[in-house]
Curated annotation (Swiss-Prot):
Keywords: Calcium, Cell adhesion, Extracellular matrix, Glycoprotein, Secreted, Signal
UniProt-listed PANTHER family: FIBRINOGEN/TENASCIN/ANGIOPOEITIN (PTHR19143), MICROFIBRIL-ASSOCIATED GLYCOPROTEIN 4 (PTHR19143:SF225)
Role played: Could be involved in calcium-dependent cell adhesion or intercellular interactions. May contribute to the elastic fiber assembly and/or maintenance.
Pfam entry (one): Fibrinogen_C
Protein name (record): Microfibril-associated glycoprotein 4
Keyword NADP: no
Transmembrane portions of the chain: none
PROSITE patterns referenced in this protein's UniProt entry, alphabetically: FIBRINOGEN_C_2 (PS51406)
Encoding gene (name): Mfap4
Positions annotated as glycosylated: N89, N139
Motif Cell attachment site: where in chain: 28-30
GO CC aspect terms: collagen-containing extracellular matrix; elastic fiber; extracellular region; microfibril
């Protein structure tokens, strides 16, 4: 099957029909009308409205006039998960600049990044937990959970604050804790270096993340297909597979705590 082109999420919205039109591409038809009427904030709201199948729905973190497509995981551990990062085949490049990571890119029915501003707005309005699901090329799976997740919750301007990550309350699902190291860090891309290292971690790691000096997690790195010779520039989760193994599938998702 031919891969879908990767578009910034905001550009994709501009090309979509009106949000309540049944032909809106990629949105579950049975859920579309009700989600537009209720204007859900996240997948928790959609689940509460009775729509409990995995798929793409519309949420409204900006308010009633700006729908945002998102993938909802309605089955894992009771469902209600709003997926903000999804990778599974390398069809979308994640080596991108600040603007793309701020606004989002890809398609919610494929590989995508929801956008830092969307994440900030969600965590500004509700308390969330984070789950990170991982799979390797031998079909082994593991996850990590954090009972507290937020993005620049106290900032006047989240962007000026660097969309700082806060996580706490690690719970191990076999993956180990590779994210607590990044808590308190600003987000960095190759064109906006906000890490603590003397060099540009995003450029060195071929990705974008809440780098410190540099990382134990690099889930937006190159899709390298398993073991690789280059150091720490694949889809790495160091506490599970180290710095020389690029994962097959990742999902980062949040649910109300």
């Amino acid at each position: 099957m031919k891969a879908l082109p990767a578009l910034p999420l905001m550009l994709m919205l501009l090309s979509m029909p009106p949000p309540c039109a049944p032909q809106a591409s990629g949105i579950r038809g049975d859920a579309l009308e009700k989600s537009c009427l209720q204007q859900p904030l996240d997948c928790d709201d959609i689940y509460a409205q009775g729509y409990q199948e995995d798929g793409v729905y519309l949420i409204y973190p900006y308010g009633p006039s700006v729908p945002v497509p998102v993938f909802c995981d309605m089955t894992t551990e009771g469902g209600k998960w709003t997926v903000f990062q999804k990778r599974f085949n390398g069809s979308v490049s994640f080596f991108r600049g600040w603007s793309d990571y701020k606004l989002g890119f890809g398609r919610a029915d494929g590989e995508y990044w929801l956008g830092l501003q969307n994440l900030h707005l969600l965590t500004l309005k509700q308390k969330y937990e984070l789950r990170v699901d991982l799979e390797d090329f031998e079909n082994n799976t593991a996850y990590a959970k954090y009972i507290d997740f937020s993005i620049s919750p106290n900032a006047i301007s989240a962007e000026e604050d660097g969309y700082t990550l806060y996580v706490a309350g690690f719970e191990d699902g076999g993956a180990g804790d590779s994210l607590s190291y990044h808590s308190g860090q600003k987000f960095s891309t190759f064109d906006r270096d906000q890490d603590l290292f003397v060099q540009n971690c995003a450029a060195l790691s071929s990705g974008a993340f809440w780098f410190r000096s540099c990382h134990f997690a690099n889930l937006n790195g190159f899709y390298l297909g398993g073991s690789h010779l280059s150091y720490a520039n694949g889809i790495n989760w160091a506490q599970w597979k180290g710095f020389y193994y690029s994962l097959k599938r990742t999902e980062m998702k949040i649910r109300r705590a």
